[in-house]
Amino acid sequence: MQYTWEDVDNEVKLLRSAWKIGNAGKARTAARRAVGMAIGIWLEKHPRPEYGSSFMNFVETLSWDESAPPNVRGAAERLCGKTSDPRKTAFSIDPMEDAETILDWIRSIQ
């Protein structure tokens, strides 16, 4: 499925709404979806097979992609983190900020 920046912006609205009412889980999910959509848009123009085919694959791959700046990789790593996984120390305590960091970078390289 092809997504547009309008789809990304709509998902960001859901993210902001969920975060505002204190639904952190829904906010993290919306952040991952928004970032996944944006990466998908970027991959249409710049195919990278190693990124896989799902939003979570996209975000996980971005977390270790050396071509991305360290702050973007860190934001992606935190968005991949699960609060219920004690082995993983990095998880997003501010999914809005992490999503915005990644989305701003993707928009800048379009």
What are these regions (language model features)?
Residues 24-31, 48-49, 92:
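Alpha-helix N-cap/helix-initiation sites
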Residues 43, 48-110:
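Long, charged low-complexity segments
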Residues 9, 21, 25-26, 66, ...:
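Helix-centric, low-specificity signal for extended rod-like, repetitive segments
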Residues 1-23:
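Charged alpha-helical initiation segments
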Residues 27-45:
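Hydrophobic alpha-helical packing segments in soluble, helical-rich domains
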Residues 12-16, 27, 34, 103:
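Heptad-repeat amphipathic alpha-helical coiled-coil interaction surface used
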